[in-house]
């Protein structure tokens, strides 16, 4: 069930993007919206199991990097914090998909639009469910790419071009700090798994931990559009209205909140 709620938005987005001409506009609407709505229903069931019944779930998909120096795995953990955000994201995304069917009805590029929406949702779920910093980083960067594509959906409009570029560049400032913090974590801990890092943190140098914490906070400020890195958020409304609702709601901006919360309280 948890693998389905994770993978359905990706499958829907890929079907709409790669097979859009064959399945048509209506087919794209049905596939992407159904996939996200089913994932949302599964997330509600998962929320009951994980949060209310206190039964966290971990899924190991395979190793990404395996060496004597560092091991990075493709692992997903559905705990109280991640399921709370995933459920919110999928419910809001399913509503945005439904609204977009009518709103984008006159646009000739529906398949591309719904593909972007679904892939954005998928990478947001990947970010929140990742069991280590590198899986989180993959989701983090790809939601930036998807948000750029969505804001710049009407790419023939100069205002949309400028807004998308501004969003992309401002987020890169925060992402640079995030990248440095992840490299520092690898150098200090020799591991990127949340559980290992959190358990070893009390034994590490406080100055190094403070520096890493500040870098992580600065990285989160970019996604959450906090003071100094908030200039991209108002201009993001240059994209279609459903894009603005998805980015301005508890989806993209919640990524920075999640990054902060996982370090305030160890996932359980």
Whereabouts are the PLM-identified features?
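...captures the hydrophobic TM-helix bundle architecture rather than a specific catalytic motif
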Residues: 1-265
């Amino acid at each position: 069930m948890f693998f389905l709620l994770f993978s359905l938005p990706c499958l829907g987005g890929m079907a709409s993007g790669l097979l859009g001409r064959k399945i048509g506009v209506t087919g794209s609407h049905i596939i992407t919206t159904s996939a996200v709505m089913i994932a949302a229903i599964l997330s509600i069931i998962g929320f009951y199991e994980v949060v209310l019944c206190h039964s966290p779930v971990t899924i190991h998909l395979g190793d990404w990097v395996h060496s004597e120096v560092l091991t990075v795995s493709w692992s997903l953990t559905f705990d109280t914090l991640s399921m709370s955000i995933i459920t919110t994201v999928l419910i809001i995304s399913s509503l945005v998909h439904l609204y977009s069917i009518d709103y984008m009805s006159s646009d000739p590029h529906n398949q591309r639009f719904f593909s972007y929406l679904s892939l954005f949702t998928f990478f947001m779920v990947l970010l929140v469910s990742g069991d280590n910093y590198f899986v989180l980083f993959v989701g983090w960067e790809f939601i930036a790419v998807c948000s750029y594509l969505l804001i710049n959906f009407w790419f023939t409009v100069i205002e949309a071009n400028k807004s998308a570029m501004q969003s992309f560049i401002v987020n890169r400032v925060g992402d640079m700090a995030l990248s440095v913090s992840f490299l520092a974590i690898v150098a200090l801990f020799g591991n990127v798994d949340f559980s290992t890092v959190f358990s070893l943190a009390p034994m590490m140098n406080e100055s190094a931990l403070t520096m890493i914490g500040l870098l992580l906070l600065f990285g989160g400020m970019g996604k959450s559009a906090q003071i100094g890195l908030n200039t991209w958020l108002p201009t993001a409304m240059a994209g279609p209205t459903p894009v603005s609702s998805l980015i301005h709601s508890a989806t993209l901006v919640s990524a920075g909140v999640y990054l902060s919360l996982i370090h305030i309280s160890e996932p359980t």
